Protein backbone atom coordinates (compact mmCIF):
# COMPACT_ATOMS: atom_id res chain seq x y z
CA UNK A 1 0.00 0.00 0.00
CA UNK A 2 1.26 3.47 -0.93
CA UNK A 3 0.05 6.76 0.50
CA UNK A 4 0.52 10.01 -1.38
CA UNK A 5 -0.18 13.59 -0.33
CA UNK A 6 -0.47 16.64 -2.56
CA UNK A 7 1.17 19.11 -0.17
CA UNK A 8 0.61 22.22 -2.27
CA UNK A 9 -1.16 23.08 -5.50
CA UNK A 10 -0.16 26.55 -6.62
CA UNK A 11 2.65 27.63 -8.93
CA UNK A 12 4.77 30.74 -9.10
CA UNK A 13 4.22 32.19 -5.64
CA UNK A 14 2.77 31.00 -2.33
CA UNK A 15 -0.75 32.19 -1.54
CA UNK A 16 -2.51 32.85 1.77
CA UNK A 17 -4.57 29.66 1.49
CA UNK A 18 -2.44 27.56 -0.89
CA UNK A 19 1.09 26.18 -0.65
CA UNK A 20 3.45 25.86 -3.58
CA UNK A 21 3.23 22.69 -5.64
CA UNK A 22 4.86 19.68 -3.95
CA UNK A 23 4.00 16.03 -3.38
CA UNK A 24 5.02 13.48 -0.76
CA UNK A 25 4.96 9.71 -1.42
CA UNK A 26 4.97 7.28 1.51
CA UNK A 27 6.07 3.72 0.70
CA UNK A 28 5.89 1.56 3.81
CA UNK A 29 7.08 4.43 5.98
CA UNK A 30 9.93 5.59 3.71
CA UNK A 31 9.24 8.85 1.91
CA UNK A 32 9.92 10.58 -1.39
CA UNK A 33 9.41 14.33 -1.74
CA UNK A 34 8.84 15.87 -5.15
CA UNK A 35 9.84 19.55 -5.22
CA UNK A 36 10.29 21.82 -2.23
CA UNK A 37 9.13 25.39 -2.57
CA UNK A 38 8.68 28.02 0.10
CA UNK A 39 6.37 26.67 2.81
CA UNK A 40 6.61 22.99 1.86
CA UNK A 41 7.74 21.93 5.33
CA UNK A 42 4.80 23.82 6.88
CA UNK A 43 2.46 21.83 4.64
CA UNK A 44 4.24 18.65 5.76
CA UNK A 45 3.81 19.58 9.40
CA UNK A 46 0.07 19.96 8.86
CA UNK A 47 -0.32 16.34 7.71
CA UNK A 48 1.96 14.99 10.45
CA UNK A 49 3.94 12.46 8.42
CA UNK A 50 7.26 13.54 9.90
CA UNK A 51 10.58 14.64 8.42
CA UNK A 52 13.13 12.06 9.56
CA UNK A 53 12.10 9.38 7.05
CA UNK A 54 12.47 11.43 3.84
CA UNK A 55 15.09 9.43 1.93
CA UNK A 56 14.77 10.84 -1.59
CA UNK A 57 14.02 14.36 -2.84
CA UNK A 58 13.22 14.78 -6.54
CA UNK A 59 13.52 18.32 -7.89
CA UNK A 60 11.87 18.94 -11.26
CA UNK A 61 13.73 22.16 -12.09
CA UNK A 62 15.59 25.13 -10.67
CA UNK A 63 12.83 27.74 -10.41
CA UNK A 64 12.39 29.12 -6.92
CA UNK A 65 8.82 27.93 -6.44
CA UNK A 66 10.20 24.38 -6.62
CA UNK A 67 13.48 24.79 -4.68
CA UNK A 68 13.57 27.65 -2.18
CA UNK A 69 12.22 25.53 0.67
CA UNK A 70 15.13 23.07 0.48
CA UNK A 71 17.59 24.55 3.01
CA UNK A 72 14.93 24.90 5.68
CA UNK A 73 13.64 21.39 5.11
CA UNK A 74 17.12 19.84 5.20
CA UNK A 75 17.82 21.63 8.47
CA UNK A 76 14.54 20.41 9.98
CA UNK A 77 15.32 16.84 8.91
CA UNK A 78 18.63 17.06 10.78
CA UNK A 79 16.92 18.51 13.84
CA UNK A 80 14.44 15.61 13.69
CA UNK A 81 17.23 13.07 14.19
CA UNK A 82 18.07 12.15 10.62
CA UNK A 83 21.56 10.63 10.35
CA UNK A 84 21.24 8.42 7.24
CA UNK A 85 22.23 9.63 3.78
CA UNK A 86 19.67 11.70 1.86
CA UNK A 87 19.62 11.58 -1.95
CA UNK A 88 18.55 14.56 -4.05
CA UNK A 89 17.99 14.10 -7.78
CA UNK A 90 17.29 16.67 -10.45
CA UNK A 91 18.24 17.94 -13.90
CA UNK A 92 21.74 18.94 -14.92
CA UNK A 93 22.81 21.90 -12.79
CA UNK A 94 20.99 20.77 -9.65
CA UNK A 95 24.26 20.17 -7.78
CA UNK A 96 25.24 23.82 -8.06
CA UNK A 97 21.77 24.94 -6.98
CA UNK A 98 21.65 22.65 -3.95
CA UNK A 99 25.16 23.65 -2.91
CA UNK A 100 24.24 27.32 -3.18
CA UNK A 101 20.99 27.00 -1.26
CA UNK A 102 22.65 24.87 1.37
CA UNK A 103 25.40 27.33 2.32
CA UNK A 104 23.35 28.14 5.42
CA UNK A 105 23.47 24.45 6.45
CA UNK A 106 27.23 23.74 6.82
CA UNK A 107 26.83 21.09 9.55
CA UNK A 108 24.06 18.71 8.55
CA UNK A 109 24.24 15.48 10.61
CA UNK A 110 23.82 13.31 7.52
CA UNK A 111 25.45 12.86 4.13
CA UNK A 112 23.83 14.58 1.16
CA UNK A 113 24.24 12.95 -2.25
CA UNK A 114 23.11 14.96 -5.28
CA UNK A 115 22.56 13.11 -8.57
CA UNK A 116 22.04 14.86 -11.90
CA UNK A 117 19.75 12.99 -14.30
CA UNK A 118 19.35 13.14 -18.07
CA UNK A 119 16.55 10.87 -19.31
CA UNK A 120 17.85 7.90 -17.35
CA UNK A 121 16.69 5.50 -14.65
CA UNK A 122 17.79 4.97 -11.07
CA UNK A 123 17.09 1.81 -9.11
CA UNK A 124 16.56 1.72 -5.35
CA UNK A 125 16.18 -0.79 -2.57
CA UNK A 126 13.64 0.33 0.02
CA UNK A 127 13.90 -1.31 3.42
CA UNK A 128 12.42 -0.38 6.79
CA UNK A 129 15.31 2.00 7.61
CA UNK A 130 16.25 3.80 4.39
CA UNK A 131 16.34 3.89 0.60
CA UNK A 132 19.55 2.86 -1.21
CA UNK A 133 20.78 3.16 -4.78
CA UNK A 134 21.09 -0.28 -6.38
CA UNK A 135 22.47 -1.63 -9.66
CA UNK A 136 20.74 -5.02 -9.54
CA UNK A 137 17.35 -4.92 -11.26
CA UNK A 138 16.26 -8.13 -9.51
CA UNK A 139 16.99 -6.80 -6.03
CA UNK A 140 15.60 -3.29 -6.39
CA UNK A 141 11.99 -2.54 -5.52
CA UNK A 142 11.74 1.01 -6.89
CA UNK A 143 12.63 2.26 -10.35
CA UNK A 144 12.79 6.03 -10.85
CA UNK A 145 12.66 7.19 -14.47
CA UNK A 146 13.19 10.72 -15.71
CA UNK A 147 12.35 12.56 -18.91
CA UNK A 148 13.53 16.02 -19.93
CA UNK A 149 10.55 18.18 -20.86
CA UNK A 150 9.95 21.62 -22.40
CA UNK A 151 10.18 24.57 -20.01
CA UNK A 152 12.11 27.82 -19.65
CA UNK A 153 14.66 26.00 -17.47
CA UNK A 154 15.97 22.44 -17.68
CA UNK A 155 13.08 20.43 -16.28
CA UNK A 156 12.42 16.75 -15.61
CA UNK A 157 9.28 14.70 -15.34
CA UNK A 158 9.44 11.66 -13.07
CA UNK A 159 7.93 8.21 -13.09
CA UNK A 160 8.05 5.92 -10.06
CA UNK A 161 7.51 2.19 -10.49
CA UNK A 162 7.12 0.43 -7.16
CA UNK A 163 7.75 -3.25 -7.71
CA UNK A 164 5.91 -5.99 -5.89
CA UNK A 165 7.64 -9.07 -4.58
CA UNK A 166 6.46 -12.32 -6.22
CA UNK A 167 4.47 -14.69 -4.04
CA UNK A 168 6.32 -17.48 -2.28
CA UNK A 169 5.09 -20.88 -3.48
CA UNK A 170 5.38 -23.78 -1.04
CA UNK A 171 4.28 -26.09 -3.84
CA UNK A 172 7.05 -24.86 -6.14
CA UNK A 173 9.69 -25.03 -3.40
CA UNK A 174 8.71 -28.60 -2.57
CA UNK A 175 8.56 -29.64 -6.20
CA UNK A 176 12.11 -28.30 -6.71
CA UNK A 177 13.38 -30.03 -3.54
CA UNK A 178 14.54 -26.79 -1.95
CA UNK A 179 15.60 -27.30 1.70
CA UNK A 180 13.28 -25.42 4.07
CA UNK A 181 16.17 -23.67 5.80
CA UNK A 182 16.82 -21.80 2.53
CA UNK A 183 13.24 -20.65 1.94
CA UNK A 184 13.55 -17.34 3.77
CA UNK A 185 16.68 -16.22 1.92
CA UNK A 186 15.28 -17.25 -1.44
CA UNK A 187 12.02 -15.45 -0.67
CA UNK A 188 14.14 -12.34 -0.13
CA UNK A 189 15.50 -12.93 -3.63
CA UNK A 190 18.98 -14.00 -2.55
CA UNK A 191 21.00 -16.60 -4.45
CA UNK A 192 22.21 -19.31 -2.08
CA UNK A 193 25.13 -21.74 -2.40
CA UNK A 194 24.29 -24.70 -0.18
CA UNK A 195 25.70 -28.21 -0.08
CA UNK A 196 27.63 -27.66 -3.35
CA UNK A 197 24.50 -26.56 -5.18
CA UNK A 198 23.25 -23.14 -6.30
CA UNK A 199 19.66 -22.26 -5.38
CA UNK A 200 17.98 -19.30 -7.10
CA UNK A 201 14.80 -17.40 -6.13
CA UNK A 202 12.87 -18.63 -9.16
CA UNK A 203 12.84 -22.10 -7.55
CA UNK A 204 10.45 -20.88 -4.85
CA UNK A 205 8.76 -17.77 -6.25
CA UNK A 206 5.79 -17.42 -8.58
CA UNK A 207 5.83 -15.03 -11.53
CA UNK A 208 6.25 -11.31 -10.90
CA UNK A 209 3.15 -9.40 -9.88
CA UNK A 210 2.10 -6.02 -11.23
CA UNK A 211 3.52 -3.08 -9.33
CA UNK A 212 2.28 0.50 -9.06
CA UNK A 213 3.30 3.30 -11.42
CA UNK A 214 3.05 6.96 -10.43
CA UNK A 215 3.99 9.65 -12.95
CA UNK A 216 4.61 13.30 -12.11
CA UNK A 217 4.68 15.95 -14.82
CA UNK A 218 4.89 19.69 -14.22
CA UNK A 219 6.11 22.90 -15.87
CA UNK A 220 6.08 21.77 -19.48
CA UNK A 221 4.24 21.77 -22.75
CA UNK A 222 2.63 18.44 -23.74
CA UNK A 223 5.59 17.18 -25.77
CA UNK A 224 5.34 14.08 -27.96
CA UNK A 225 7.48 11.86 -25.72
CA UNK A 226 5.24 12.23 -22.66
CA UNK A 227 2.43 9.76 -23.52
CA UNK A 228 4.87 6.85 -23.73
CA UNK A 229 6.69 8.01 -20.59
CA UNK A 230 3.48 8.01 -18.51
CA UNK A 231 2.06 4.91 -20.23
CA UNK A 232 -0.26 2.83 -18.03
CA UNK A 233 0.31 4.97 -14.94
CA UNK A 234 -1.94 4.00 -12.06
CA UNK A 235 -1.81 7.64 -11.02
CA UNK A 236 -0.80 10.54 -13.25
CA UNK A 237 -0.16 13.82 -11.42
CA UNK A 238 0.07 16.64 -13.92
CA UNK A 239 0.24 20.38 -13.95
CA UNK A 240 -2.88 22.27 -14.95
CA UNK A 241 -1.59 25.80 -14.76
CA UNK A 242 -4.51 27.12 -16.79
CA UNK A 243 -8.07 25.84 -16.47
CA UNK A 244 -9.67 27.68 -19.35
CA UNK A 245 -9.19 26.71 -22.98
CA UNK A 246 -9.03 30.45 -23.70
CA UNK A 247 -5.66 30.58 -21.93
CA UNK A 248 -3.94 28.36 -24.50
CA UNK A 249 -1.79 31.26 -25.78
CA UNK A 250 -0.56 31.93 -22.23
CA UNK A 251 0.18 28.23 -21.81
CA UNK A 252 2.24 28.15 -24.99
CA UNK A 253 4.10 31.37 -24.14
CA UNK A 254 4.91 30.35 -20.56
CA UNK A 255 5.53 26.67 -21.39
CA UNK A 256 2.73 25.26 -19.26
CA UNK A 257 -0.51 23.38 -19.97
CA UNK A 258 -4.27 23.82 -19.84
CA UNK A 259 -6.55 21.28 -18.14
CA UNK A 260 -7.61 19.97 -21.54
CA UNK A 261 -4.01 19.42 -22.64
CA UNK A 262 -3.19 17.54 -19.42
CA UNK A 263 -6.26 15.35 -19.85
CA UNK A 264 -5.28 14.61 -23.45
CA UNK A 265 -1.92 13.34 -22.19
CA UNK A 266 -3.68 11.11 -19.65
CA UNK A 267 -5.88 9.67 -22.39
CA UNK A 268 -2.98 9.07 -24.79
CA UNK A 269 -0.96 7.48 -21.98
CA UNK A 270 -3.86 5.18 -21.04
CA UNK A 271 -3.53 6.22 -17.40
CA UNK A 272 -5.92 5.08 -14.71
CA UNK A 273 -6.43 8.42 -12.94
CA UNK A 274 -5.40 12.06 -13.41
CA UNK A 275 -4.83 14.54 -10.60
CA UNK A 276 -4.46 18.14 -11.75
CA UNK A 277 -2.24 20.48 -9.73
CA UNK A 278 0.20 23.44 -10.03
CA UNK A 279 -2.46 26.06 -10.67
CA UNK A 280 -1.75 29.63 -11.69
CA UNK A 281 -2.06 32.11 -8.82
CA UNK A 282 -4.83 33.75 -10.86
CA UNK A 283 -6.82 30.49 -10.93
CA UNK A 284 -8.72 30.90 -7.66
CA UNK A 285 -11.34 28.19 -8.32
CA UNK A 286 -9.76 25.46 -10.49
CA UNK A 287 -12.69 23.11 -9.82
CA UNK A 288 -14.84 25.37 -12.03
CA UNK A 289 -12.84 24.20 -15.05
CA UNK A 290 -12.73 20.48 -14.24
CA UNK A 291 -15.16 19.61 -17.04
CA UNK A 292 -12.57 20.78 -19.56
CA UNK A 293 -10.48 17.82 -18.43
CA UNK A 294 -13.36 15.37 -17.92
CA UNK A 295 -14.58 15.86 -21.48
CA UNK A 296 -11.31 14.26 -22.59
CA UNK A 297 -10.42 11.99 -19.66
CA UNK A 298 -13.30 11.23 -17.32
CA UNK A 299 -11.30 10.02 -14.32
CA UNK A 300 -9.82 13.45 -13.62
CA UNK A 301 -9.85 15.33 -10.33
CA UNK A 302 -8.64 18.74 -9.18
CA UNK A 303 -6.19 18.55 -6.30
CA UNK A 304 -6.43 20.61 -3.15
CA UNK A 305 -3.72 21.21 -0.57
CA UNK A 306 -3.49 18.22 1.75
CA UNK A 307 -5.24 15.78 -0.60
CA UNK A 308 -4.26 12.23 0.42
CA UNK A 309 -4.54 9.31 -1.97
CA UNK A 310 -3.98 5.63 -1.15
CA UNK A 311 -2.89 3.22 -3.89
CA UNK A 312 -3.22 -0.52 -3.37
CA UNK A 313 -1.51 -3.34 -5.21
CA UNK A 314 -3.91 -5.38 -7.32
CA UNK A 315 -3.51 -9.16 -7.50
From Swiss-Prot:
It comes from the Bacteria. CDD domains: RNaseZ_ZiPD-like_MBL-fold. The keyword Metal-binding applies. One of its GO terms (molecular function) is zinc ion binding. It holds the Pfam family Lactamase_B. Its EC number is 3.1.26.11. Keywords: Endonuclease, Hydrolase, Metal-binding, Nuclease, tRNA processing, Zinc. InterPro entries: Metallo-B-lactamas, RibonucZ/Hydroxyglut_hydro, RNase_Z/BN. SUPFAM superfamilies: Metallo-hydrolase/oxidoreductase. Zn(2+) 1 binds at residues 61, 63, 151, 219. Binds 2 Zn(2+) ions. The active site is at 65 (proton acceptor). It catalyses: Endonucleolytic cleavage of RNA, removing extra 3' nucleotides from tRNA precursor, generating 3' termini of tRNAs. A 3'-hydroxy group is left at the tRNA terminus and a 5'-phosphoryl group is left at the trailer molecule. It is an enzyme of class 3 (hydrolase). Its cofactor is Zn(2+). Homodimer. Zinc phosphodiesterase, which displays some tRNA 3'-processing endonuclease activity. Probably involved in tRNA maturation, by removing a 3'-trailer from precursor tRNA. HAMAP family: RNase_Z_BN. Belongs to the RNase Z family. This is Ribonuclease Z. It comes from Clostridium botulinum (strain Alaska E43 / Type E3). The gene is rnz.
